[in-house]
Amino acid sequence: MSAQSPTVATACASIRFAELEELLHQVFVRHGTSAQVAAILAHNCASAERDGAHSHGIFRIPGYLSTLASGWVNGTAVPSVTDVASGFLRVDAGNGFAQPALAAARPLLVEKARSAGIALLAIHNSHHFAALWPDVEPFAEEGLVALSVVNSMTCVVPHGADRPLFGTNPIAFAA
């Protein structure tokens, strides 16, 4: 008797980027984020989905909602941007998501990069930075070079190693 391979039929549907972004926005707001935080998270997740990185698209929504429901993350946090030096900003994300912290700092960071030739941003007191490329691409669109690094749980074992050393998304570059 031969093994039978079950066929799984899956329905596929297409949705326009703006519609997905709006749907995700509504989901985030209904689960306790401010409208501003929801817009930023929705854009990030929709961008990841559009770009084929499903692991950082709508796949992430249950995790986001779980952290909101448990109080692990503050969905209404208002990031506080501190101008530290001519080429340095620091953002306290207020125990919120990291993406809104970056969004709050981006205009001044771009200004500093143009005037000082280089700028550094440090975000602290934040949760889950998600996929990095949607957050560095706007700097490239401004004609700048951007490098983003993030610490995360170690789960990637480098070639030749015997234990995890890197997170799954430690570096992004845009030009």
Tell me the role of every PLM-derived stretch.
Residues 2-31:
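Generic N-terminal amphipathic, Lys/Arg-enriched alpha-helix
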Residues 6, 10, 75, 100-103, ...:
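Metal- and O2-centered redox machinery and metal/ROS homeostasis
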Residues 12-20, 33-59, 73-84:
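N-terminal glycine-rich anion-binding loops that anchor highly charged ligand groups
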Residues 16-24, 37-44, 57-60, 64, ...:
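General structural feature for long, well-ordered alpha-helical segments within catalytic domains
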Residues 24, 28-32, 49-53, 65-72, ...:
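Structural signal for hydrophobic packing residues in well-ordered secondary-structure cores
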Residues 29-30, 39, 43-46, 99-102, ...:
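Alpha/propeptide regions of enzymes that mature by internal proteolysis
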Residues 56-110:
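Active-site cofactor/substrate anionic-group-binding motifs, chiefly glycine-
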Residues 118-175:
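Glycine-rich anion/phosphate-binding loop at the beta-strand->alpha-helix junction
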